[in-house]
């Protein structure tokens, strides 16, 4: 497994234990009494990813404003982008998890993929330093960053600006249901805007459900947006 993923990510660990930790899902602890999982490395990897992406954008777009750089960074470190990168290296098949977690689709769970990818970045940073982490991140993010000619706007931002232009109260998002197991929850969010029909959407986390609800609302009112 170590040799296979090392070839895929083009990085060979000097300390394979770090890679093992980065790929260990929390569900494995209670089963095998292991004292580690990827959560601590995920915390570190998130910080490393943010600083490397920030510096990369700063260098690629010397004329961009702070606001545009921030929007691009948000798009590059968001869950959807992390999942795309994780799927491109088939990370899910390498995550060590309990049989129950895998049976429930844990290898394809977006939260698991996001967390394991950030943990992998953290492990590379500890094993090879900042340069190694930069090389890994650049190889999977730089092409996307270079082709971001127009600063991306998420659905919530577009909807917020449209509603402000109508001089209406800001959209509000309310969690009306949470179902599923703790390791793979499903949130149902209701979007409310005065004078508009309420919209409901679901997602594996609150932010994703809110974005889906905003996107559905935009689709409903698209003829009003010029």
From Swiss-Prot:
Keywords: Cytoplasm, Endonuclease, Hydrolase, Magnesium, Metal-binding, mRNA processing, Nuclease, RNA-binding, rRNA processing, rRNA-binding, tRNA processing. One of its GO terms (molecular function) is rRNA binding. The active site is at 46, 118. Its EC number is 3.1.26.3. One of its GO terms (cellular component) is cytoplasm. Its main location: cytoplasm. Its cofactor is Mg(2+). It is an enzyme of class 3 (hydrolase). It catalyses: Endonucleolytic cleavage to 5'-phosphomonoester. Transmembrane segments: none annotated. Mg(2+) binds at residues 42, 115, 118. It is found in: Cytoplasm. PROSITE patterns: DS_RBD, RNASE_3_1, RNASE_3_2. GO terms for biological process: mRNA processing; regulation of gene expression; rRNA processing; tRNA processing. Residues 154-223 form the DRBM domain. Coiled coil: none annotated. SUPFAM superfamilies: dsRNA-binding domain-like, RNase III domain-like. Residues 2-129 form the RNase III domain. Digests double-stranded RNA. Involved in the processing of primary rRNA transcript to yield the immediate precursors to the large and small rRNAs (23S and 16S). Processes some mRNAs, and tRNAs when they are encoded in the rRNA operon. Processes pre-crRNA and tracrRNA of type II CRISPR loci if present in the organism. Homodimer. Belongs to the ribonuclease III family. This is Ribonuclease 3. It comes from Ehrlichia canis (strain Jake).
